[in-house]
Amino acid sequence: AFAGVLADADIKAALAGCAAADSFNYKTFFKFFAIIDQDHSGFIEEEELKLFLQTFSAGARALSDAETKAFLAAGDSDGDGKIGFVALVKA
């Protein structure tokens, strides 16, 4: 699913980081969600998605309205206009 989205080297590095049994840390995934969920509502809303790149680097650009809406549509499985943790996992 990430092939073509992430560089092969990045995918390999991520997989190598959790190759050993019991090395996957689900808390890291929760931290990722919490970082993007700036208002700690338990959901990632449109404005938080717009600033998604800036969670990685303060100098990064904001996503365009079209990019933000496409991102939201891809992750909003129940059509409520926001992405919950369960929806993110299912996306």
Curated annotation (Swiss-Prot):
GO cellular component: cytoplasm
InterPro entries assigned: EF-hand-dom_pair, EF_Hand_1_Ca_BS, EF_hand_dom, Parvalbumin
Listed SUPFAM superfamilies: EF-hand
Secretion signal span: none
Binding positions (Ca(2+) 2): D76, D78, D80
Assigned keywords, A-Z: Acetylation, Allergen, Calcium, Metal-binding, Muscle protein, Repeat
The keyword rRNA processing belongs to this UniProt entry's keyword annotation: no
Gene3D superfamilies: EF-hand (1.10.238.10)
Modification N-acetylalanine, positions: A1
PROSITE patterns named in the record: EF_HAND_1, EF_HAND_2
Binding of Ca(2+) 1, residues: D37, D39, S41, F43, E45, E48
Annotated ranges, domain EF-hand: 24-59, 63-91
Function: In muscle, parvalbumin is thought to be involved in relaxation after contraction. It binds two calcium ions.
Family to which the UniProt record says this protein belongs: Belongs to the parvalbumin family.
Identification of the protein by name: Parvalbumin beta 4
